[in-house]
Amino acid sequence: MSSKKIVLTSSDDECFEIDEAVARKMQMVAHMIDDDCADKAIRLQNVTGKILAIIIEYCKKHVDDVEAKNEFVTWDAEFVKNIDMDTLFKLLDAADYLIVIGLKNLIAQAIADYTADKTVNEIRELFNIENDYTPEEEEELRKKNEWAFN
């Protein structure tokens, strides 16, 4: 018995034909299927083809994740290991939009792990945060919260 196919179209017009079970790992898409809105291609305005391909890869691997939880710990770690930070941020946005909770949590943890040993200035640079403290204000904060800067 073959599975029903769902077509997803990215914001840059890449089409992906995937099994319904894989598509249902994306809760937003699952709701569209349940509401009979998936007869034709489902257009995902906020997700590029590059990002959608990565999400589909994750969903394909996790389609039967109830049976093999331990197997995924290693696979998930390898999955995010070589993805650059810019792509991780885009994946996080897309996983949030598509409601892929496991992927969203995985990426959030990967970003947290990456930033764990960074300095304040490195984190500002990573997240494009402007330092709006005067040197005097910053020095006062460093003294007041010395424990956080060691």
Swiss-Prot record:
GO cellular component labels: nucleus; SCF ubiquitin ligase complex
Pfam families linked to this entry: Skp1, Skp1_POZ
Major location category of this protein: nucleus
Pathway in which this enzyme or protein is active: Protein modification; protein ubiquitination
Database matches in SUPFAM superfamilies: POZ domain (SSF54695), Skp1 dimerisation domain-like (SSF81382)
Disulphide bonds in the chain: none
Keyword Mitochondrion annotated: no
Tissues where this protein is expressed: Mainly detected in the siliques.
UniProt region (Interaction with the F-box domain of F-box proteins), positions on chain: 92-150
Compartments in which it is found: Nucleus
Keyword annotations: Nucleus, Ubl conjugation pathway
Subunit structure: Part of a SCF (SKP1-cullin-F-box) protein ligase complex. Interacts with CPR1/CPR30.
Other remarks on this protein: This protein was called 'Meidos' in memory of one of the murdered sons of the mythological 'Medea', as MEIDOS is repressed by MEDEA.
Name of this chain's protein: SKP1-like protein 17
Organism, scientific name: Arabidopsis thaliana
Gene: ASK17
